[in-house]
A protein has these predicted regions:
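Well-ordered alpha-helical segments within folded domains of soluble proteins
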Residues: 531-542, 548-552, 585-589
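Bacterial Sec-dependent N-terminal signal peptides
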Residues: 1-30
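Extracellular/oxidizing-compartment recognition motifs
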Residues: 29-112, 116-525, 532-533, 549-552, ...
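Short, intrinsically disordered, charge-balanced linker/junction segments flanking boundaries
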Residues: 25, 333, 581-589
């Protein structure tokens, strides 16, 4: 017994170590959050060398990746069998898990791939395979567009193109707005086609300049706002990919596209910071349909598309937008619509721009801001207070018994007489809606512009339930739609001091209201990508939002804007050449 007890005590540490090792081996770690080019399920990445990222998860501290293995396959079935029939990286000894370059054979344009990852920790333990992720490659060259053409409703007026913008400042001898800009009408275009077999996968690739909205069988495709992202359109334009598999019908289908001006063409008539034009609104489009039997079909933009004026009668990225609901042609984006009064689209050049996939997250309606109070101004107009200053547009809900025009005047401030004040934000800016006037409830919101505002002054209508001797349209509701870049929120802040919380909220609203497809200086007066904002705010914003794709786009804008002598101007995209005091100065860019 004297010898047995010391022997038992000597074995206890060994037993403890053995049990500990078993516990360590039982501890779990896994791989998740797979991304390609910082996007979870991209539909159109550049086929040449996409970069892959993932996160390591563990139930203990200090778990580090020591190696990884990536499988890329051309079908979910192959990937489920652990068959990387496109690329098997093998076991790679590396702790890298962010933007790992794809190292397999060249990927094909316009194809779908799937991939997964497993990792090893520092102790040599291997994780399970991650859940599969998907990636789609974009269109690498114009040949991949299968003959798609740039089309428009009317040809460019080359003599009135004005590539370099003017700022509207007065100089000796008169204003610099001395060059007219063509009064292009805003088009809608349509095309019918037939899906002849069961569909496996269908994608739409589209670029509409300056902005576009796409419709399939009468419904808007996607939830994006102000597509595509702003670029220097004489050099580069970005196309957007949509998965339309679920929207296609067996048999007859119809695709429709509405075009807005955006930063492609800034018309006269209202407030504008810059005056320039790249030409008439235009678009290029390819629908790629893959059938279950392995065959394929493409529908491309050409002069067989039909074109007509849209109900959007005025649109300016600066000055606002007008819409005439009495001019709506019901069913125009549905199969069977009678378009005999329409005309064929015209072929146009598209200025020979380079087409690349959209880089940043799209803009979207990210929040609805209801009216908190309303009051009457001295001029008799009604003013709606949303209680929050934000970037976005107005959603109007109204009822009218005859076609009448309603003017919505947005602003951040109000005057002493309670009318909206636009002195510091740029004016005149307004949204105008002409009702159908059939007695039903109508709802409308601008499609191709936005502003920064808290108040909305309504001219030509009264709130429902108020005295209405003039039989004006009755406003049922005014709601603010906050639009911004849809970069995901990744951080939060809260503390015990209400003042700090309020300061954080104030700054956060300012940041998100200036997150467009560039980081703007303001959401109304200029809307330009001043690069000092990108530089000074980036380090802070990344703690609140995932701006990786937005900043990739901004860097691309800087590269495109760079001059031959190496100088990067203070704004990118460079829509205007400022004076020497502003074009190259560190405090502004």
């Amino acid at each position: 017994m004297k010898q047995t007890l010391p022997a038992l005590l000597r074995t206890l540490p060994l037993l403890f170590l053995s049990c500990s090792a078993g516990v360590l081996q039982a501890q779990v770690f896994s791989v998740s959050e797979l991304r390609c080019e910082q996007s979870q399920r991209p539909l159109a990445v550049e086929p040449a060398g996409p970069r892959l990222s993932w996160q390591l998860n563990a139930d203990r501290r200090g778990c580090l990746q020591s190696a990884y293995r990536i499988l890329v396959a051309d079908s979910p079935v192959a990937l489920a069998d652990d068959n990387g029939n496109v690329w098997d990286s093998g076991k790679v000894f590396s702790d890298q898990s962010v933007l790992v370059p794809y190292g397999g054979p060249a990927l094909q344009s316009g194809k779908a791939y799937c991939w997964k990852v497993q990792a090893w920790d520092a102790d040599g333990n291997v994780s399970p395979w991650s859940l599969p992720a998907s990636l789609g490659t974009g269109l690498m060259s114009l040949q991949d567009w299968n003959g798609a053409k740039w089309i428009a409703m009317e040809p460019d007026v080359d003599s009135l193109k004005c590539i370099e913008g003017n700022t509207g400042e007065w100089k000796d001898g008169g204003p610099v707005f001395d060059k007219p800009v063509a009064p292009y009408k805003l088009p809608q275009l349509r095309r019918e086609f037939t899906a002849t077999k069961p569909v496996k996968r269908a994608l739409a690739y589209i670029c509409g300049l300056g902005q576009f909205e796409m419709f399939l069988n009468g419904e808007k495709v996607g939830d994006h706002f102000l597509d595509p992202a702003w670029t220097k359109f004489d050099k580069e334009a970005q196309y957007v990919a949509f998965d339309i598999t679920g929207e296609l019908r067996d048999g007859k289908n119809a695709v429709g596209v509405m075009l807005g001006n955006g930063y492609y063409h800034t018309p006269h008539g209202r407030y504008l910071k810059l005056l320039f034009s790249y030409g008439a609104p235009k678009m290029i489009c390819k629908l790629q349909i893959e059938y279950a039997d392995g065959t394929a079909q493409t529908v491309v933009s050409d002069d067989k598309w039909r074109a007509s004026e849209s109900p959007v009668t005025f649109s300016s990225i600066y000055g606002g937008e007008d819409y005439d609901a009495s001019a709506v042609q019901p069913g125009w984006a549905e199969p069977g619509f009678d378009d005999r009064k329409w005309k064929n689209a015209v072929l146009t050049q598209g200025a020979g721009v380079k087409l690349i996939p959209q880089i940043s997250e799209p803009l979207k309606v990210m929040e609805r801001i209801p009216t908190v109070r309303r009051f009457r101004a001295a001029n008799g107009n009604w003013v709606y207070d949303l209680g929050q200053n934000a970037s976005g547009i107005v959603q109007l809900t109204v009822r009218a018994v005859t076609p009448q025009s309603i003017k919505l005047i947005p602003g951040e401030l109000i005057n002493d007489d309670s009318t909206v004040n636009q002195r510091s934000s740029g004016g005149p800016v307004f949204f105008s809606y002409t009702t159908r006037g059939d007695g039903s409830v109508e709802s409308w919101q601008p499609q191709f512009t936005y502003y920064g505002f808290r108040y909305v002054e309504v001219e030509g209508a009264v709130p429902a339930g108020e005295s209405n001797p003039g039989a004006l349209p009755e406003v049922i509701d005014i709601t603010g739609l906050h639009t911004r870049n849809s970069a995901a929120q990744v951080g939060t802040f809260a503390c015990s001091d209400p003042l700090f919380d309020k300061i954080h909220s104030l700054i956060d609203w300012a940041v998100r209201s200036n997150m467009a497809s560039v980081l703007t200086d303001c959401p109304h007066r200029e809307k330009l990508g001043w690069l000092e904002v990108t530089h000074l705010m980036g380090g802070s914003i990344q703690y609140r939002y995932d701006i990786s794709r937005l900043y990739a786009k901004q860097v691309n804008d800087m590269r495109t804007a760079q001059h031959a002598d190496g100088m990067v101007p203070t704004i990118a995209p460079q829509y205007v050449t400022f004076s020497p005091d502003f074009i190259d100065t560190p405090e502004w860019g």
